[in-house]
Amino acid sequence: LEIKLDYWSIDYSDVITIESAQGIVAATPLAPAVKRTIDGTLIGVTTGYFNASNVKTDGIDFEVNYSFDTSFGDVELGLSGSHMNKYEIPNAKGETQDVVGLFNHDNFARSLPETKMTLSAILNSGPHKLALYGKHISDYKTTRALSDTAKSRGYTQKIDEWFSVDLQYNYTFDMDDNQIRLTLGGINILDEDAPLVFDAANFSYDSRQHDIRGRIMYVGIKLIR
């Protein structure tokens, strides 16, 4: 049994980051950087890079591994993940704001779910290897106001938690002085839909955290010299 637990704390100074297009529009809707048609329709926002004030963040990384022998082969079980306690950034008032657990459509931070974890179970038996992975992302929320259309379709500001399962099988055999490894696998084998996010006029999803492609099956062959 192996257990690892790490606490980390980082204080960034003068972080170089890109401006938030949504933040520019919200703060100065008629600024030169905001491009509109003659009738006032928004068509684009010119953004640039700037030095942000201090950014403070801390959290915990954890990992648990356990292995044992069976009549079928060697089994490895694992749990790893990260929990972010805070991610403080400056806001327009010159104060700090903790943006953990938010989609962050209106600032330079990315979407920040509090917790992400991976469960694993691996069986090694001679030339055979079977691996199962479960990936969990905790829920978070968007602070963007919902339109009446979004509400009528059942959208809320909550972005649901997501759990997906990957499966992979490998078979390795000798050929002359080399080895050949055959692989068959699936990503998101349960075909779990990515949580929907109401983002501006689009009924979209968070590409930084979730995968909208659904179930993906693959095969592979590898020559090992």
Regions found by a protein language model. Name each.
Residues 134, 143-168:
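Generic long, charged, amphipathic alpha-helical segments
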Residues 85-86, 134-147, 171-225:
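C-terminal beta-signal and adjacent terminal beta-strands/loops
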Residues 8-146:
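Gram-negative outer-membrane beta-barrel transporters
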Residues 56-60, 113-117, 161-165, 178, ...:
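Residues that define the transmembrane beta-barrel architecture of outer-membrane proteins
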Residues 2, 6, 74-76, 129-131, ...:
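Membrane-spanning beta-strand positions in outer-membrane beta-barrel proteins
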Residues 70-72, 160, 175-177:
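A cross-taxa feature marking solvent-exposed loop/turn segments within ectodomains of secreted
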Residues 62-66, 79, 119-123, 167-171, ...:
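Residues on the lipid-exposed face of transmembrane beta-strands in outer-membrane beta-barrel proteins
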